[in-house]
């Protein structure tokens, strides 16, 4: 804001006005807020970015001249506008009040503003400080990330605002009330576990407006483990189903074996069906030769695991090792090579 807006005035008029203002606000005059001889001290004005700020100066009939300044820049002198900023307008100029408005306030408008008056040939001033508040805004946040279990992870969330916002990280994929993680721009997780996967929420708050919230997803890879594998009893001629459930990220791939033979859909009236975490081996018409131990193998890029499941008939004793036909299944997996040995004893 400056005096250049009146360069279109005749130069003589400009000189006269300049001299009058020099007389009005002489160099070295101290700022006095709350002076007993000044009509009224002014409180600080606080507005949000984008709103309008009204600066009010209470005066009386002793005032002969009055002006508003921003630091050393003249905005208005009486009804004469010196600022070239179209956002600055005069609201009231009466014997009791002299007020201006700054529209669409921005952060660079923040600072001291001075109301200067001339009374009884003595200049007096009162200062008001304009405070501009800015809602919180997250400017930079980490992207979604995939890591292996046991790795270290650092998430970043940078936010701006006035006052400076408080940044909080929270894990959303846990029970309510247990999701608080940290109150910092950086979230560091060492030796990450599979139950620490999921969405993490960054919230920036400064009480000026609603918090700015962004989310980051962490995917934790881990090798398979079989969570459900149950022996099944069924009579000859009936339908029998063996099921095998495995948790893994990425999703596990399943294979079924009986002794040293890898099974496939269509082999001897069997069907293998894989759906997500579950794999089933279905016998549509169980015969005596179908009874025995079967091995479910779950594999992903981080490792493998297996479980032995028994299909048995009526009267069979199953206690983990069949008393009629004890067996030990051993599996070695390396890359895509899988060797299967079935040892009876």
Curated annotation (Swiss-Prot):
Superkingdom assignment: Eukaryota
Outcome reported for the amino acid change (mutating residue 95 to R): In ovarian cancer; somatic mutation
UniProtKB keywords: Cell adhesion, Cell membrane, Disease variant, Disulfide bond, Glycoprotein, GPI-anchor, Immunoglobulin domain, Lipoprotein, Membrane, Repeat, Signal
Glycosylation sites per record: 44, 70, 140, 285, 293, 306
Keyword Cell membrane: yes
Membrane topology: Lipid-anchor; GPI-anchor
Cystine pairings recorded for this chain: 57-115, 157-202, 244-296
Any single Pfam family the record assigns to this protein: I-set
First and last residue of the signal peptide: 1-27
Propeptide: 323-345
Tagged with keyword Transmembrane: no
Lipid linkage positions (GPI-anchor amidated asparagine): 322
A Gene Ontology biological process term: cell adhesion
Domain Ig-like C2-type: 39-126, 136-219, 223-310
PANTHER family documented for this protein: IGLON FAMILY OF IMMUNOGLOBULIN SUPERFAMILY-RELATED, OPIOID-BINDING PROTEIN_CELL ADHESION MOLECULE
Disease: Ovarian cancer: The term ovarian cancer defines malignancies originating from ovarian tissue. Although many histologic types of ovarian tumors have been described, epithelial ovarian carcinoma is the most common form. Ovarian cancers are often asymptomatic and the recognized signs and symptoms, even of late-stage disease, are vague. Consequently, most patients are diagnosed with advanced disease.
Family: Belongs to the immunoglobulin superfamily. IgLON family.
Function, in words: Binds opioids in the presence of acidic lipids; probably involved in cell contact.
Protein name: Opioid-binding protein/cell adhesion molecule
The organism of origin for this protein: Homo sapiens
Organismal lineage: Eukaryota, Metazoa, Chordata, Craniata, Vertebrata
